[in-house]
Curated annotation (Swiss-Prot):
Protein function: Transaldolase is important for the balance of metabolites in the pentose-phosphate pathway.
Keywords: Cytoplasm, Pentose shunt, Schiff base, Transferase
Reactions listed under catalytic activity: D-sedoheptulose 7-phosphate + D-glyceraldehyde 3-phosphate = D-erythrose 4-phosphate + beta-D-fructose 6-phosphate
Protein's recorded name: Transaldolase A
Pathway listed: Carbohydrate degradation; pentose phosphate pathway; D-glyceraldehyde 3-phosphate and beta-D-fructose 6-phosphate from D-ribose 5-phosphate and D-xylulose 5-phosphate (non-oxidative stage): step 2/3
SUPFAM superfamilies in UniProt: Aldolase
Signal peptide: none
Amino acid sequence: MNELDGIKQFTTVVADSCDIESIRHYHPQDATANPSLLLKAAGLSQYEHLIDDAIAWGKKNGKTQEQQVVAACDKLAVNFGAEILKIVPGCVSTEVDARLSFDKEKSIEKARHLVDLYQQQGVEKSRILIKLASTWEGIRAAEELEKEGINCNLTLLFSFTQARACAEAGVFLISPFVGRIYDWYQARKPMDPYVVEEDPGVKSVRNIYDYYKQHHYETIVMGASFRRTEQILALTGCDRLTIAPNLLKELQEKVSPVVRKLIPPSQTFPRPAPMSEAEFRWEHNQDAMAVEKLSEGIRLFAVDQRKLEDLLAAKL
């Protein structure tokens, strides 16, 4: 049995890609997207028809060019998502504009709009996850959206504090970023030789997974942002893992036994009182890595969102 099939015995595998052909090849349960992946896929000629449809939609649904570009971007994200849902049996994650990461109300408004666009294409709400950055405002937006039956994927998650706040808000799923945590520590104190058990990104997800299971939180833990297959194999047993095509390929090509590494702890504890905003901000601020990577992640997604807008604006 190859390693990918071995992992699938214990964990739901998700494709971290907007490349429809690539997703088709690896048979994942779900797929995740973000502005960077959308931008990459939009540059491929085989998806020109999805772009043309989004452009036509933008022209029809915006008065100014700026409004047309925003409308086209939203439609393009949904077009890709709807196509992906034709080949995955589960759900697809679609991201709210990163520039709204500190605006709860506008994040909610954008999320509702994206869901509405999906429903216009005949996609059920249950098959959509709305991705929001794990800021205080993003978590509060998700809390409200969950009450409306809109499931959310809280992304750019780097600290235990963010994970705890998400669970307390009752969000559907979180995406702790293994690789980006590893990158930060590796740049400051390189691990040589590499020991996966000491990988700070892997340890972070394990801690979150154990905490959630010990306190009976139903929020799904989906490890994300992997740099190497060792990180993925070390988290086998996690609820879900979202994996880029290059790593899916490596796992599919290697035949070796896969052992479950994450197992729910038998001991359970009562849940603590929910954190206040002040507690959240203070505790998160104590983690220099998380503060830096969250702000950087928001900036990078915003840059790619603008690039996507420029690409579409040139076609309007």
